[in-house]
């Protein structure tokens, strides 16, 4: 693996929160994915999201990060990471999760679908 990538294994909730808070970007490169909690958690902690354009990921990220289609787009991902994004984009990602995907709104939507 690249020296900038670490495989950490299982982490506690506290460890995950610390990792998110100390990370500028969160990458979700799934080929199939519903609505990944990990992207929501990372954005809530201020990570700028980068995700594949599949299922629920674009709904979560919106215009607060980068969406890509295939492995061929990884040059675009690299350029995005090196573009100098910072505090403003981090705050936008956090604000989007709080306003659109907070737990109360998610529970209400589930209740609406059940009724």
Segments from the language model and where they lie:
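Short hydrophobic beta-strand element within catalytic cores of glycosyltransferases
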Residues: 48-51
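Short alpha-helical segment that forms part of, or immediately flanks, the ligand-binding pocket
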Residues: 17, 36, 40-44, 55-59
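Structural motif corresponding to alpha-helix initiation and N-cap regions
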Residues: 10-14, 71
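Nucleotide-activated donor-binding/catalytic signature segment of Leloir-type glycosyltransferases, i.e.
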Residues: 1-10
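Short alpha-helical donor nucleotide-sugar binding micro-motif in glycosyltransferases
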Residues: 18-23, 28
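Aromatic "clamp/platform" in nucleotide-sugar-dependent glycosyltransferases that forms part
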Residues: 31
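A charged, aromatic-enriched C-terminal amphipathic alpha-helix characteristic of glycosyltransferases
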Residues: 72, 85-115
């Amino acid at each position: 693996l690249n020296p900038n990538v670490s495989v950490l294994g299982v982490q506690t909730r506290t460890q995950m929160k610390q990792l998110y808070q100390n990370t500028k970007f969160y990458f979700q490169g799934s080929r199939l994915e519903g609505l990944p909690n990990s992207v929501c958690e990372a954005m809530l902690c201020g990570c700028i999201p980068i995700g594949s354009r599949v299922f629920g990921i674009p709904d979560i990220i919106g215009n607060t990060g980068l969406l890509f289609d295939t492995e061929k787009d990884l040059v675009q991902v690299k350029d995005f990471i090196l573009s100098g994004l910072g505090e403003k984009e981090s705050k936008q990602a956090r604000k989007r999760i709080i306003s659109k995907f907070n737990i109360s709104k998610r529970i209400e939507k589930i209740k609406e679908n059940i009724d």
